[in-house]
Amino acid sequence: MNYPNGKPYRKNSAIDGGKKTAAFSNIEYGGRGMSLEKDIEHSNAFYLKSDIAVIHKKPTPVQIVNVNYPKRSKAVINEAYFRTPSTTDYNGVYQGYYIDFEAKETKNKTSFPLNNIHDHQVEHMKNAYQQKGIVFLMIRFKTLDEVYLLPYSKFEIFWKRYKDNIKKSITVDEIRKNGYHIPYQYQPRLDYLKAVDKLILDESEDRV
């Protein structure tokens, strides 16, 4: 049997129960090849669909410089620039808790540099934490393929050290000791709320 274009029909072995296609045989449970932002996006979609949590990425603020109005009913933006975010990347609600966090990736194998965290972001994290929010930094070491949740209560110690010009980064060992490892799995790939559960339990004891 041929298709209308003359090409012969071939059975789909995956549908017929034969050899699996590459899409199913090469499933990877690690995070290689996918950005941290994409992993979080997939996890948040899973949480929302499963009625577990409502967490979203905040839109990057844009400063519009030049707008053209070819018609009264239309506006064309000719020039615009992304502005430096004034807060963190993500926020939402999980089991009655306000969640607020910043997500960062680094290719560095031994430490996480602090020069790409901004003062106003840390100030926002501090304010949210003081209101009993669950605030943290999510860090992925790309080369090591490891992801950690570093609570704000621990992060602020390293941030003060950085601002005092003592050390410009947080070592991997310091993050492993003070943070929570988030292992990759199947669904969702990055189930970071399991680490959040541990953080909530620990901080509920610390804040009593």
From Swiss-Prot:
Keywords: Cytoplasm, DNA damage, DNA recombination, DNA repair, Endonuclease, Hydrolase, Magnesium, Metal-binding, Nuclease. Binds 1 Mg(2+) ion per subunit. It catalyses: Endonucleolytic cleavage at a junction such as a reciprocal single-stranded crossover between two homologous DNA duplexes (Holliday junction). It is found in: Cytoplasm. Mg(2+) binds at residues 87, 89, 102, 121. It holds the Pfam family RecU. Its cofactor is Mg(2+). GO terms for cellular component: cytoplasm. The keyword Membrane does not apply. Belongs to the RecU family. Endonuclease that resolves Holliday junction intermediates in genetic recombination. Cleaves mobile four-strand junctions by introducing symmetrical nicks in paired strands. Promotes annealing of linear ssDNA with homologous dsDNA. Required for DNA repair, homologous recombination and chromosome segregation. This is Holliday junction resolvase RecU.
